[in-house]
């Protein structure tokens, strides 16, 4: 009888433990991975800002983990496979990836959906004011800083200059913005390309040692039907006075950094995250 009593107590105890555990399991947060970028880069700063934004951090339905990555293309691939739920990807990579037109990669990335615009990355081409360079086409035979190899700046410079037919006609120097500005100041470069927000510290640096000018890249793009072939680029103006000595508006174009999601992320989760004030999130960047 005592043995039966013990068995009954054990069974009741097990049932009670399961009953108490059930609500905990049901209320477990969904863990979401947000792909950022290399340490110190803007993509990773965005991912960290979203992870730590109080309304998202305090959600009872899900938790967000910012995960570093190589950047836009890796985020595209990881989000497409579901290894990341969200990520930051350039609109150009989203467009070309869906079309199967990425360089050396014909796979179609169709499970990546754009859910929000984050910020613009404008093209800027710096030359000396007295150099007689009025168009990107005038760079033939010149020494040009084209961005770090493997960077978005380098990729978009290659894309644009190849479209114009000058990529193989310039002396390319792959280097970061600050190094390019220093080389420009030492007369080792005739021009350098950036794909970043303005005002850029590198351009400010260059303007301290040289009278600089920015090239009207929008006109080159229009004349060559660049926007028709790559419609994800948008036009913009670098306002007069952004840099020392640049006293007129300079037309250009930009790509956009997008917040993207895997197609299988629940709609209510995406809606809830985007219901937060995105502007306030970006203030933390």
Which residues are covered by each model-predicted region?
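Bacterial N-terminal signal peptides that target proteins for export
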Residues: 2-12
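C-terminal segment of classical bacterial N-terminal signal peptides
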Residues: 18-26
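Bilobed "Venus flytrap"/periplasmic-binding protein-like clamshell domains
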Residues: 29-57, 62, 121-186
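N-terminal (or domain-start) structured segment
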Residues: 29-96, 105
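Acidic, polar ligand-binding/catalytic clefts
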Residues: 86-119, 197-201
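Pocket-lining segment of extracytoplasmic ligand-binding domains
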Residues: 91-93, 101-103, 131, 168-266
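Short amphipathic alpha-helical coupling segments at ligand-binding clamshell hinges
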Residues: 266-276
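Conserved small/polar residues in nucleotide/adenosyl-binding loops
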Residues: 284-285
